[in-house]
């Protein structure tokens, strides 16, 4: 591995590890999309406890689970494709290298593909855990009785939100794996492309969390919803 490759890989690892702490810092200072959605989903679960018929909640959860399942299935196909090249022997690697990848030693090409595979595998594990938690939340919604005491409603709503929020956070982490896998794939065309790709992905993710129209809309919704939620 050359020095530019090593530096670009170090930058990739730095961006991967720094994204979470930076997101937490943004949440404390000015808010982030993921942090604001925690409040929105908590408000949803609180509203769910006041509904006698919870068909709409079940339908929304079912749609969310289907979305996570689609991403997980696509992720699995991508893993199979990359693993097929990586473990397919020298002929598969040489055939892949001949279609436009930067000419490099076989071991370095394997390292580049392994990085893509690692990002996808991490994303798949996040999607699987997300789907499991969403199923737990769906079961809780289905089992929720008609409650008349406000304290009981608050307790049930908090419990449901405590299941749903980590589930959707894991889903977000899985989607993030796609972005970093795309940046890792840029390494196939050279170390400079890896550096550009990971910086571009990092900046795009931060912008979407902090300054995108969706982030601003959700932040405005949080300001409306939060005063009506029970104090913790």
Question: Where would I find each of the regions flagged by the language model?
Answer:
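Transmembrane alpha-helical segments and their cytosolic interface motifs
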Residues: 57-84, 113, 166-195
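Alpha-helical transmembrane segments and their membrane-interface exit regions
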Residues: 18, 200-212
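Membrane-interface amphipathic/juxtamembrane segments adjacent to transmembrane helices
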Residues: 24-64
